[in-house]
Curated annotation (Swiss-Prot):
One of its GO terms (molecular function) is structural constituent of ribosome. GO terms for cellular component: cytosolic large ribosomal subunit. SUPFAM superfamilies: Ribosomal proteins S24e, L23 and L15e. Belongs to the eukaryotic ribosomal protein eL15 family. NCBIfam families: PRK04243.1 (NF003269). Residues 159-172 have a biased composition (Basic residues). InterPro entries: Rbsml_eL15_core_dom_sf, Ribosomal_eL15, Ribosomal_eL15_arc, Ribosomal_eL15_CS, Ribosomal_uL23/eL15/eS24_sf. SMART domains: Ribosomal_L15e. HAMAP family: Ribosomal_eL15. The gene is rpl15e. Disulfide bonds: none annotated. This is Large ribosomal subunit protein eL15. It comes from Methanosarcina acetivorans (strain ATCC 35395 / DSM 2834 / JCM 12185 / C2A). Residues 153-196 are annotated as: Disordered.
Length: 196
């Protein structure tokens, strides 16, 4: 079977440090650092990944690039008396992943659009960059698209903020089932955040 163009692009992005993507990324990051936190772009950087997540080159679909800080929640060690359990040094779980933060920021910048999905495009020592696919639920082209018109339903409002995207479901523990996930359903909050 003949591999498609998208297959070659996907292979190049699997190991970006070892392929031509590394040189392109070095040039791109210099430009991206000077741009704002949420930047609308003309076309996706990773066309294979965007299309697999639902992107189509048609009216009503917008792609934005978002940069977010890197790293976990650094916690300063208390210098006064504490119980070891209350120091919070061993593990501080973030409420949202870096990718979810990027999706929510894009959602707030474009309140009339809904987040479809997002994917990683680059990182340096300080920031991570994600591209977020946004859909206009009121656009007639989207309403007539049989693959995307589910976004027009009122139940799909605020997908990013409610954790209904792919990254959001993963962060809420909905990506796994069975043994070991007892504290993630019906929700993280219902189990007093013990599922994090």
């Amino acid at each position: 079977m003949v591999k498609s163009f998208y297959g070659y692009v996907r292979d190049a992005w699997k190991n970006p440090d070892e392929t031509y993507v590394n040189e392109l990324r070095w040039e791109r990051l210099q430009v991206w650092r000077k741009q704002g936190s949420v930047t609308r772009i003309e076309r996706p950087t990773r066309i294979d990944r965007a299309r697999s997540l639902g992107y189509k080159a048609k009216q009503g679909i917008v792609v934005v690039r978002v940069n977010v800080r890197r790293g976990g929640l650094g916690h300063v060690r208390p210098n006064r008396g504490r119980r070891t359990q209350k120091m919070g040094k061993n593990k501080v779980s973030g409420g949202m992943s870096i990718q979810r933060i990027a999706e929510v920021r894009a959602d707030r910048r474009y309140p009339n659009l809904e987040v479809l999905n997002s994917y990683w495009v680059g990182e340096d020592g300080k920031h991570k960059w994600f591209e977020v696919i946004l859909v206009d639920p009121h656009h007639p082209v989207i309403k007539s698209d049989k693959n995307l018109n589910w976004v027009c339903d009122p139940s799909s409002r605020g997908r990013a903020t409610r954790g209904k995207t792919s990254a959001g479901r993963k962060g809420r523990g909905m990506a796994t089932r069975g043994k070991g996930t007892e504290k993630t359903r019906p929700s993280i909050r219902a189990y007093k955040s013990r599922g994090k």
